[in-house]
UniProtKB/Swiss-Prot annotation:
It is found in: Cell membrane. This is Contactin-5. It is a lipid-anchor; GPI-anchor. The lineage of its organism: Eukaryota, Metazoa, Chordata, Craniata, Vertebrata. Contactins mediate cell surface interactions during nervous system development. May contribute to the formation of somatotopic maps of cerebellar afferents during the development of the nervous system. Glycans are attached at N65, N123, N324, N376, N467, N706, N743, N858, N929. Residues 1-19 form the signal peptide. It comes from Gallus gallus. PANTHER family: CONTACTIN-5, PROTEIN SIDEKICK.
C-alpha cells in the first residue's frame, strides 16, 4: 500500500511538470571555444560564451578543471545570460579547462571543454653572450635560447644590425623548432654579430636576444668532411588530419650538403612541397594515407647521412550516430546507441544530468550502448554520450521522458450512440491514453462480453463486430486499467435497415445546348433522415459557381432531382448521387455523353513551302461524339486583318483527311496557319497556330497604281505613283523601273528606283520645254527578276515660271495700318501662276529690304495689315508657281492714314428717362499728325457681355434706347479715316422697367475728362431732336 502511495505521489508530481506539452530539456545553441588571452590586452576581460534553449528557460553554472566556480563570491566573475565573463584575468588563477553546465526542470547537460590560455612573451636574459670562434669551412650552430612564452613563436636572426636579416639558403638554416641558426660551412662573409629575434604569433610582440659574435680562428681552414645531421624531425611525428605537417632536416658539412626526402616503402605525397632549400618537407591537408616512415638524406662528395622518423596521423572523434530524444512508458526498456569514428578509436562514457552514470542492476553500458531495463520515473532526465580519444572529446545529448499516467479517453472517442445498418462491419474504438499500457475489458449491458467469430477485441483494445444484426443492438462499455487508475467509456449501438438508391436515367446522350433532369430516389429506414449530394466525376458540384447550369431540386423527402440546363461539352462525365444517413451512405452513378462541335485539331505542321503554296498536316482533335465532316484552313500574315480562310487543294477538305495544300499565297510573306474542324453540330475551336513560315521569293506581279504627274520646276518631268505594299513585293531587292518617252516617239527611257518606299521620280532635261506631253509607265522588279508595268498614261513636263507681270495694280489705304492691294493678270499658256507675291517697303528704304506676303491661290487682291500709320509705302506684285517667280509689276505708291485722334470725347453728359438715355459731349479736336474727325460712335453693351451695339452720328449728341432690363455700359469715341479714336470712360446706366417717367424723375449726369470745374443749373430739360 505504501508503495502504491509513493508511485501515485510521483505520478501526480510528474503530471504537473508535464502539463505543458511544449516543455523540453536544455539544448546547447552555443558552446564555449578555446580562448587565448594576451596578458598585455587593454580590454582586461575574457568572455567564455554559452547559450542554450529549453522550456522552462535553463539556468547556467560553470566548472573550472572539474570544480564549480562560485560566481557570487568572486567579484571578478559575472554571468551575462549563459556566458562567463572574467575581469582582470590572471594566469595563475584562471588558466585551465572550462565547462558550461545548463539546467532546467528536466535535467542538466555539460558543454565541451574550453581551454583558457594566456599569451605572453618574456625578455631574453641581458647577460652578454660569448663569442663563437670557428675555422673557415667548419659548421656552426648559434643558440637562440628563447625566453618564456605562450603560445608558439616565430624565429628569425638579425646580422650585425636591425633590420638586416639572415637570408636562409642551402648553407644557412633557422629551425622553427629550436630557434637556432645553423651554418653548414662558415665563410669569411659570415663573420659578425648575430641576434635572435622572436615574435609571438598571437600578440605579435617581438624581443631581441643579446648579440652573439661569430669570429674565425687563425689556425687554418677546415678540410672537407661528410655531412652531420644537426636538425631533424622527431622519431615519431603526430599530426591531426587536415592540418599542415612540417618536418625539418639540416646538416653541417664541407662541401655544403644537399638534402633529399623520400617516403620509405611508398611515394612522396603529390601535394608535398620542399621549402628552405629542401630543408623542410611540408605536407598540407595531411590525411591518413600520408602516414608512414619518412627519410631525410644529407649528402656531399665526402659521404652521406640519413635520418628516419614515423609520421602518425590522428583524427578527432566525429559522430556517426547521435542520440535522439525518447519517450517511454514506465516499465519499458531503453536502448540508446551512439557511434563515433576517430583514430585512435574512441572510447565512450555516459553522463546523466552532467554527472557520470555508472552500471547498476537495471543499468548496463557496453561500449557505445546504454540499456536501462524496466524504466521508471527516476530514470527521466538529460543524458549525454561522450566519445573520446587522446586528442579530443565530443558530446551528444538527448532527453529521456518517462510517461506515467492513469487511463484517459480522448474526446473524439466519446461517441454515445453508434448507428449502423444490417450486415455492416463496425469498430467501437477503445484506445485509452495511459502509461503503462492498460488492460482492456468489454461489457455488453451488465455482462462481460464474450468474443466469437463475429465479435472480437482487436489488439489495441477496440471492439469489432462483423455482419451486424438486430441482436447486436445494446449498450457497450470499455474499461482500461493500469497501476495508476482506470477509466471507462460507454456507447449504445443501434442497427437499422440498409439504404438503397436508384439514379435514372442510366446513360444519356445529349447535344450541346440541350437540358436534362436526373432523378435520384432512396429507400431507407423510416426512422432516419436522408441527405442528397450530387457529384460530377467524383467531385462535389458547386451550385453557386456553375453559372446557372446546375440546379438541385428536392421534390420529396426521399428523392431529389438534378437539373442541367444549356449543357456544355465540359458537363460530360459521370454524375453521382450520394444518399447519406446517420447509419450509412450509398451512391449510384450515371454517365452523360455530350455531343458538340469538334475540339481543336492537333499540332499543325507546315511542309513543302513554295512561293504561293504550303502543305499542311495535322492530327484530328476530339470529334465530341459527332464525326468531323470537313476542315477549314486559315492563315494570318502581318498584312491581314486577323485570320482569313485560304484557298486549298482540294477545295473541300473532308473530315477523314489530315493534310491539304494552301494555295494562292503571296510570295515572300510570313504566314501562320491553323485548322478548324466542323461536324453536323457546328464548328469547333481552331487549332493552335503553326510555326511562322515565309513563302519563297518570286518575280513581282503587282505594278504600282495611280501613276500620274506632279508639279515641278522648269525642265522637270515629275512622275508619281502609289508604292506597292510589302505584301506584294514578292522578295528582297524590290524597286521600281520608271519608263517614259515624249508623246508620239518610239524609244523608252528607263530609270531604276531602288527604294521600295519611293513614290515619285524626277527627270530633268534643260531641253524639255514646259508642258511637254510624255507617255509614262512604272514597272517593278526584285532579286528574282522584272515584273509587269503599269498601264501607260500621258502626263506633261513642268510648266515654266510666269512671264507676264500683273497689270492695273491699285493700292488703297483703308486705315492707319491697312492697305488693300488689287491687280489683274494676263493669262499664259506655259506659266500658269499658283499664286501672287506682294512686296512692300517704306519710302526711305530700298526695294531689297521689302517685306513679302503670298496669296494662297489665284486671288486678285490682298489686304496688308500691321503697317505704320501716316507712312508712304511702295508696292509690287508678281506671280509665282513651282517653276519660279515671274517679273514684278510697276511699283505703286500709297500712304497709310494718319493715326486716329488720341483724345477721347470729354464732358460726356447724359439724361435718363426710363429706357431712353440722351447723351452729349464736347467735340474732339485732332492733333496735327492725327486724322480729321468724320463723326462719332456710341458703343452700347450689357454689363458682362462682350458684343457691343454701335450707333454712329455726325453730331456731338445721341439718344440711346436701352433694349432690356439690366445694367448697360456706354462709351463714346471719335471716327476718322485713320480709324476709331480713344473711347471715353465707361458709363454704367441701369435700365428700369415700368411706366412713363416724368421730367421730375429725370436726372442730369455729367462726366468730365478735363481738370476744369463745371457747374450746371438744372431748371427743366426736355430731350429734343437737336440734342
Amino acid at each position: 500500500m505504501m508503495w502504491l502511495s509513493w508511485k501515485l505521489f510521483l505520478f501526480l508530481s510528474l503530471i504537473g511538470c508535464l502539463s505543458e506539452s511544449v516543455d523540453y530539456g536544455p539544448v546547447f545553441v552555443q558552446e564555449p571555444d578555446d580562448v587565448i588571452f594576451p596578458t598585455d590586452s587593454e580590454e582586461k576581460k575574457v568572455s567564455l560564451n554559452c547559450q542554450a534553449h529549453g522550456s522552462p528557460t535553463p539556468t547556467y553554472r560553470w566548472l573550472r578543471n572539474g570544480t564549480e566556480i562560485d560566481v557570487e563570491s568572486d567579484y571578478r566573475y559575472s554571468l551575462i545570460e549563459g556566458s562567463l565573463i572574467i575581469s582582470n584575468p590572471n594566469e595563475m588563477k584562471d588558466s585551465g579547462q572550462y565547462q558550461c553546465l545548463t539546467t532546467n526542470m528536466f535535467g542538466s547537460i555539460l558543454s565541451r571543454e574550453a581551454v583558457l590560455q594566456f599569451a605572453y612573451l618574456g625578455n631574453f636574459s641581458g647577460r652578454t653572450r660569448s663569442a663563437v670562434s670557428v675555422r673557415e669551412g667548419q659548421g656552426v650552430v648559434l643558440m637562440c635560447s628563447p625566453p618564456l612564452h605562450s603560445p608558439e613563436i616565430i624565429y628569425s636572426w638579425v646580422f650585425n644590425e636591425f633590420p638586416s636579416f639572415v637570408a636562409e639558403d642551402s648553407r644557412r638554416f633557422i629551425s622553427q623548432e629550436t630557434g637556432n641558426l645553423y651554418i653548414s660551412k662558415v665563410q669569411t662573409s659570415d663573420v659578425g654579430s648575430y641576434i635572435c629575434l622572436v615574435k609571438n604569433t598571437v600578440t605579435n610582440a617581438r624581443v631581441l636576444s643579446p648579440p652573439t659574435p661569430l669570429t674565425l680562428r687563425n689556425d687554418g681552414v677546415m678540410g672537407e668532411y661528410e655531412p652531420k645531421i644537426e636538425v631533424h624531425f622527431p622519431y615519431t611525428v603526430t599530426a591531426a588530419r587536415g592540418t599542415t605537417v612540417k618536418m625539418e632536416c639540416f646538416a653541417l658539412g664541407n662541401p655544403v650538403p644537399t638534402i633529399s626526402w623520400k617516403k620509405v616503402n611508398g611515394h612522396n605525397p603529390s601535394k608535398a612541397r620542399l621549402r628552405k632549400s629542401q630543408a623542410v618537407l611540408e605536407i598540407p591537408n595531411v590525411q591518413l594515407e600520408d602516414a608512414g616512415m619518412y627519410e631525410c638524406k644529407a649528402e656531399n662528395s665526402r659521404g652521406r647521412n640519413v635520418f628516419r622518423g614515423q609520421l602518425q596521423v590522428y583524427t578527432y572523434p566525429q559522430w556517426v550516430e547521435k542520440l535522439n530524444d525518447t519517450e517511454l512508458d514506465s516499465g519499458e526498456q531503453l536502448r540508446w546507441e551512439c557511434k563515433a569514428t576517430g583514430k585512435p578509436r574512441p572510447t565512450y562514457r555516459w553522463l546523466k544530468n552532467g554527472v557520470p552514470l555508472w552500471p547498476q542492476s537495471r543499468i548496463e553500458m557496453i561500449n557505445s550502448v546504454l540499456m536501462i531495463r524496466t524504466v521508471n520515473i527516476s530514470d527521466a532526465g538529460m543524458y549525454q554520450c561522450l566519445a573520446e580519444n587522446k586528442y579530443g572529446t565530443i558530446y551528444a545529448s538527448a532527453e529521456l521522458k518517462i510517461l506515467a499516467s492513469a487511463p484517459t479517453f480522448p474526446l473524439n472517442q466519446m461517441r454515445k450512440t453508434i448507428i449502423i445498418t444490417k450486415g455492416q462491419e463496425v469498430v467501437i474504438e477503445c484506445k485509452p491514453q495511459a502509461s503503462p499500457k492498460p488492460t482492456i475489458t468489454w461489457k455488453k449491458g451488465d455482462k462481460a462480453l464474450r468474443e466469437s467469430k463475429r465479435v472480437t477485441i482487436l489488439p489495441q483494445g477496440s471492439l469489432r463486430i462483423l455482419n451486424a444484426s438486430k441482436s447486436d443492438e445494446g449498450r457497450y462499455s470499455c474499461r482500461g486499467v493500469n497501476v495508476f487508475g482506470s477509466a471507462e467509456i460507454v456507447a449504445s449501438v443501434s442497427v437499422k435497415e440498409p439504404t438503397r438508391i436508384e439514379l435514372t436515367p442510366k446513360k444519356i446522350e445529349l447535344t450541346v445546348g440541350e437540358s436534362i433532369v436526373l432523378s435520384c430516389k432512396a429507400l431507407h429506414d423510416s426512422t432516419l433522415d436522408v441527405t442528397f449530394y450530387w457529384t460530377l466525376n467524383g467531385q462535389p458540384i458547386d451550385f453557386d459557381k456553375e453559372d446557372g447550369h446546375f440546379e438541385s431540386i428536392k421534390a420529396q423527402a426521399s428523392s431529389a432531382d438534378l437539373m442541367i440546363r444549356n449543357i456544355l461539352l465540359m458537363h460530360a462525365g459521370r454524375y453521382g448521387c450520394r444518399v447519406q444517413t446517420a447509419a450509412d451512405a450509398v451512391s449510384d452513378e450515371t454517365e452523360l455523353l455530350v455531343r458538340g462541335p469538334p475540339g481543336p485539331p492537333g499540332v499543325v505542321i507546315v511542309e513543302e513551302i513554295t512561293d504561293t503554296t504550303a502543305t499542311l498536316s495535322w492530327s484530328p482533335g476530339a470529334d465530341n461524339h459527332s464525326p468531323i465532316s470537313l476542315y477549314n484552313l486559315q492563315a494570318r500574315s502581318p498584312f491581314s486583318l486577323g485570320w482569313q480562310t485560304v484557298k486549298t487543294v482540294p477545295d473541300v477538305i473532308s473530315g477523314d483527311m489530315e493534310s491539304a495544300m494552301a494555295v494562292e499565297l503571296n510570295p515572300w510573306v510570313e504566314y501562320e496557319f491553323r485548322v478548324v474542324a466542323t461536324n453536323k453540330i457546328g464548328t469547333g475551336d481552331p487549332s493552335a497556330p503553326s510555326r511562322m513560315i515565309r513563302t519563297n521569293e518570286a518575280v513581282p506581279k503587282t505594278p504600282p497604281a495611280n501613276v500620274s504627274g506632279r508639279s515641278g520646276r522648269r525642265h522637270e518631268l515629275v512622275i508619281a505613283w502609289e508604292p506597292v505594299s510589302e505584301e506584294f513585293q514578292n522578295g528582297e531587292g524590290f524597286g521600281y523601273i520608271v519608263a517614259f518617252r515624249p508623246n508620239g516617239t518610239r524609244g523608252w527611257k528607263e530609270k531604276m528606283v531602288t527604294s521600295s518606299d519611293a513614290s515619285k521620280f524626277i527627270y530633268r532635261d534643260e531641253s524639255v520645254p514646259p508642258l511637254t506631253p510624255f507617255e509614262v509607265k512604272v514597272g517593278v522588279y526584285n532579286n528574282k527578276g522584272d515584273g509587269p508595268f503599269s498601264p501607260i498614261v500621258v502626263i506633261c513636263s513642268a510648266e515654266g515660271e510666269p512671264t507676264a507681270a500683273p497689270i492695273d495694280v491699285k493700292a488703297t489705304s483703308l486705315s492707319v495700318s491697312e492697305i488693300l492691294v488689287a491687280w489683274k493678270h494676263i493669262k499664259e499658256s506655259l506659266g500658269r501662276p499658283q499664286g501672287f507675291e506682294i512686296g512692300y517697303w517704306k519710302d526711305m528704304e530700298q526695294e531689297e529690304a521689302a517685306e513679302k506676303v503670298k496669296t494662297a491661290g489665284n486671288e486678285s487682291s490682298l489686304l496688308l495689315t500691321g503697317l505704320e500709320g501716316n507712312t508712304l509705302y511702295h508696292l509690287t506684285v508678281r506671280a509665282y508657281n513651282a517653276a519660279g517667280y515671274g517679273p514684278p509689276s510697276t511699283a505703286v505708291r500709297v500712304a497709310t492714314k494718319k493715326s486716329p485722334p488720341s483724345q477721347a470725347p470729354s464732358n460726356v453728359m447724359w439724361i435718363q428717362d426710363g429706357s431712353h438715355v440722351s447723351l452729349g459731349w464736347e467735340p474732339v479736336r485732332p492733333l496735327a499728325n492725327e486724322s480729321e474727325v468724320m463723326g462719332y460712335k456710341v458703343l452700347l453693351r450689357q454689363e458682362g457681355q462682350s458684343n457691343s451695339q454701335v450707333i454712329e452720328t455726325q453730331k456731338t449728341s445721341a439718344v440711346v434706347i436701352l433694349p432690356d432690363v439690366g445694367v448697360y455700359i456706354i462709351e463714346v469715341c471719335a471716327v476718322s479715316e485713320g480709324g476709331d479714336g480713344t473711347a471715353s470712360p465707361q458709363i454704367r446706366v441701369p435700365s428700369y422697367a415700368g411706366g412713363k417717367v416724368t421730367s421730375a424723375q429725370s436726372t442730369l449726369h455729367m462726366f468730365s475728362t478735363s481738370s476744369s470745374s463745371v457747374t450746371l443749373l438744372l431748371v427743366l430739360m426736355v430731350p429734343s431732336t437737336s440734342w
